[in-house]
């Protein structure tokens, strides 16, 4: 399996950006700020631009596509419930590890001050908002969930949960009306979703240049080896979280289905390799379905129902990533996230992961949503771009392993009912 061209270009841009900045941090600083950093800013803005349309399109389409669950209520209920439970577990694992290891605290106060100065206008606003959030009541997150004006909510990335709430409500309402009346608007959102995915493809074509600009500016504006140390700690924290999710899957497989965990891993290994090489749950779906049906002996009616839904709404690897990355960036900027704010990360990451497109690097766009909702500077994305692509490949392995796990659970329940 080989990297695609975009992957190679992103890695090359990271290396060239680092080398360029290490060679000339002083004389080239003004040049980089004026002529290179803007490309990174454009890339970040394009990610923020597509975040709300992605949530609207993918969630409304995803929920309305579950119409068939009314015919398969038993299988559908088990499938959705299990997927949501594993996603909540994934976010919780990420939050637990990042709060214990604290990778963002590995940088010195000097480096933190330089970062805050570099992104001062954004970070100070976020810090003030975080302090205000600490003084809110226990039910304030529930109040904030329901928008008083959807147009106003959609105009500000800070109100992502309100957009998610409206999108899910809209999709459920489409299911509840006669299909003949729902068809025109469903066709619209199906097409709208395809357009959004194509826009994401176009944005990610620009990714190597954006990553280059962000990395070059980051190293020039905060030139400290602490950043490399903190990135290493962040990467290790995330990889540990992903490894723990694999262990949790194996325990679930053993305890609920009685299967041998080693045999389970051997059966889905080819699908994991494809997932690692493509970074796409959707591209891996045919291989996953083949391995689950022919090597895990899951009935075709179960695998053909559970796995396509999983490729859309089950992004456990992405969920671990959202939690670790969001808190890591907050720690790096010296933001103290309250318990309520971290609960908000669980709900936002869970719901946003459902709306995540099963395409490479969709997690970055979802992370924009989580950061905005939690009041964390989106500019902090520059901190993790350098290592995101290889970690994205690992996240996808966890995503499809979770899909295979849930399919075996649903198969077990179906057999017990029969």
Question: What is each model feature region?
Answer:
Residues 51-55, 207-211, 280-288, 302, ...:
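Transmembrane helix boundary and interhelical junction motifs in multipass membrane proteins
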Residues 64-71, 106, 178-183, 191, ...:
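Juxtamembrane helix-boundary/capping and inter-helix hinge elements in multi-pass membrane proteins
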Residues 323-418:
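Transmembrane alpha-helical segments and their short flanking loops
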Residues 252-310, 329-338:
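Membrane-embedded helical hairpins/re-entrant loop segments and their flanking transmembrane helices
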Residues 19, 25-28, 32-33, 44-47, ...:
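Signature of multi-pass transmembrane helix bundles
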Residues 28-35, 73, 224-233, 257-269, ...:
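Membrane-water interface of transmembrane alpha-helices in multipass transporters/channels
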Residues 71-78, 198, 202, 295-309, ...:
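Membrane-interface alpha-helices at helix entry/exit sites of multi-pass transporters
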Residues 1-17, 22:
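Single conserved hydrophobic/aromatic residue that forms the stacking wall/gate
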């Amino acid at each position: 399996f080989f990297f695609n061209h975009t992957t190679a270009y992103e890695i090359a841009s990271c290396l060239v950006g680092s080398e360029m900045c290490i060679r000339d941090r002083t004389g080239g600083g003004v040049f980089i700020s004026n002529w290179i950093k803007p490309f990174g800013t454009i890339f970040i803005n394009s990610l923020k631009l597509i975040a709300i349309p992605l949530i609207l399109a993918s969630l409304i389409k995803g929920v309305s596509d579950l119409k068939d669950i009314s015919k398969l209520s038993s299988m559908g209920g088990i499938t959705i419930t299990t997927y949501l439970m594993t996603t909540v577990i994934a976010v919780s694992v990420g939050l637990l590890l990042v709060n214990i290891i604290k990778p963002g605290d590995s940088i010195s106060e000097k480096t933190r001050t330089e970062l805050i100065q570099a992104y001062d206008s954004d970070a100070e606003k976020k810090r003030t908002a975080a302090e205000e959030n600490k003084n809110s009541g226990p039910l304030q997150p529930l109040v904030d969930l329901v928008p008083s004006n959807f147009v106003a909510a959609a105009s500000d990335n800070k109100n992502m949960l309100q957009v998610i709430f409206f999108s899910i409500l809209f999709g459920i309402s489409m299911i509840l009306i006669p299909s003949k009346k729902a068809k025109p608007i469903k066709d619209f959102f199906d097409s709208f979703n395809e357009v959004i995915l194509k826009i994401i493809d176009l944005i990610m074509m620009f990714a190597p240049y954006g990553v280059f600009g962000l990395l070059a500016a980051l190293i020039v504006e905060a030139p400290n080896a602490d950043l490399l140390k903190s990135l290493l700690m962040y990467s290790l924290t995330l990889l540990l979280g992903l490894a723990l999710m694999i262990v949790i899957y194996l325990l679930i497989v053993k305890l609920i289905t009685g299967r041998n965990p080693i045999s389970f891993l051997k059966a889905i290994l080819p699908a994991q390799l494809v997932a690692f090489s493509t970074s796409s749950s959707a591209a891996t779906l045919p291989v996953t379905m083949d391995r689950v049906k022919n090597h895990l002996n899951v009935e075709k009616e179960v695998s053909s129902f559970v796995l396509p839904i999983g490729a859309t709404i089950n992004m456990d690897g992405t969920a671990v990533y959202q939690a670790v990355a969001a808190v890591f960036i907050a720690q790096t900027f010296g933001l103290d996230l309250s318990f309520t704010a971290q609960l908000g990360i669980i709900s936002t990451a869970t719901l946003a992961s459902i709306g995540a497109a099963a395409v490479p690097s969709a997690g970055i766009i979802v992370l924009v949503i989580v950061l905005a909702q939690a009041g964390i500077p989106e500019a902090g994305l520059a901190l993790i771009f350098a290592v995101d692509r290889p970690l994205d490949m690992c996240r996808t392995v966890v995503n499809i392993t979770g899909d295979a796990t849930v399919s075996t659970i649903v198969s077990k329940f179906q057999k017990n009912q029969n």
